[in-house]
From Swiss-Prot:
Cellular localisation: Cytoplasm
Domain of life (superkingdom): Bacteria
Pfam family of the protein (one): Prismane
Protein name as catalogued: Hydroxylamine reductase
Binding residue positions for [4Fe-4S] cluster: C5, C8, C17, C23
Cofactor: [4Fe-4S] cluster; hybrid [4Fe-2O-2S] cluster
Keyword Iron: yes
Organism this protein belongs to: Thermotoga petrophila (strain ATCC BAA-488 / DSM 13995 / JCM 10881 / RKU-1)
HAMAP family reported in the protein's UniProt record: Hydroxylam_reduct
Co-factor note (free text): Binds 1 [4Fe-4S] cluster. Binds 1 hybrid [4Fe-2O-2S] cluster.
A cellular-component GO term for this protein: cytoplasm
Amino acid sequence: MQMFCYQCSQAANGTGCTEYGVCGKSPTVARLQDNLVFAIKGISAYYYHARELGYDDPEIAGFLDEALYSTLTNVNFDAQSFVEYALEAGRMNLRAMQLLKKAHIETYGEPTPVEVETGTKKGKGIIVTGHNLKALEELLKQVEGTNVYVYTHSEMLPAHGYPGLRKYKNLVGNLGKAWYDQRKLFTEYPVAILGTSNCVLIPSESYRDRMFTTSIARLPGVKHIDGYDYTEVIEKAKSLPDLEEKPGSYKLRTGFSTSVVVSLADKIKELVEAGKIKHFLVVGGCDVPFKRNEYYREFVQKLPKETVVITLACGKFRINDLDLGDIEGIPRLIDVGQCNDTIVAIEIAQALAKVFGVEVTDLPLTLVLTWMEQKAVAILWTLLALGLKNIYVGPVLPAWVNEDILKVLTAEFGLKTISEPEKDIKEILKV
């Protein structure tokens, strides 16, 4: 099947065009339109969360209108223009991430490094999953002074880095890892669960009656909370058995904001010039429950000790329990936050380039990314729009990429797919 399009009444056989569009749309144009729609979805997620906090950008809204309109039937048949739209989507996603970062910092303060407990505290519990810091804050306000303790899950882990959230004493730790462990995790712990955004799964019957959604998230058979009154969530938590006091087997470090890392720039420069840091790698992204994604942990474990790894998004959970140590006080594993905090990794790279007096593309920097869904598509186009090279992606290429699109991505943008950890390390470090 070369393409699939069934958005108009002319769809072949009444089911969909699979070889060529009845309208004249080529398979490559159809796939590039799909790519653009996916990127728009990713931008919309970040833009939505920024607007929840009262931050807006009409330029982003204008782009979303135009770009989505361009995919309507009989509007645009030009493949090159859709490549340009994709790059513009990358630039707009950059604006959206900048806007959301601004919203988060002005609302909750700039993150600072913190160690997060992975065990449980004696008392009642609520697990918060998703990405929505506003929902978490409102819940924390409402459980103050009670024995109902709040635990983050997956992409909510970076919340602990924000001073304005960390100040709440009922925010006590993080349970679980990436989004796909939730059915097992939520069954294991007798707690109330609040799903705040994407990355929620249809629940099993073992916990459906103690799960709630809020904001954009909704699940069949699960009570949805409109607004931010979480009384029902808290009462459900109170009705459940206490969690026992149980220390975690390790702690997780997060909260490395742009300012924190940039404050170390002179020391980093000194270590690079002394040959004690030889390469920086961004290893992270959206994780998936594939055996293939064991690659990322093995990759980091096999890196030489003269490397520094920046991680982000739920892909961090493949590696963030590893003790990589430090290089004269510079941590070898730096967690900069959620997937939208790709902007932090970008700003760090730009700051280091300025310190060394070079372009970002001249830094000893490689990106090794895992992708899962549409937000990752938007982020990839952001990186490509910035002209970044040395990007490895896995576990698989997006299904919308055909040979023509792959040629553009590899020839013009230098995109590569992951192979085997040792092979890729040798290629990256040229050893």
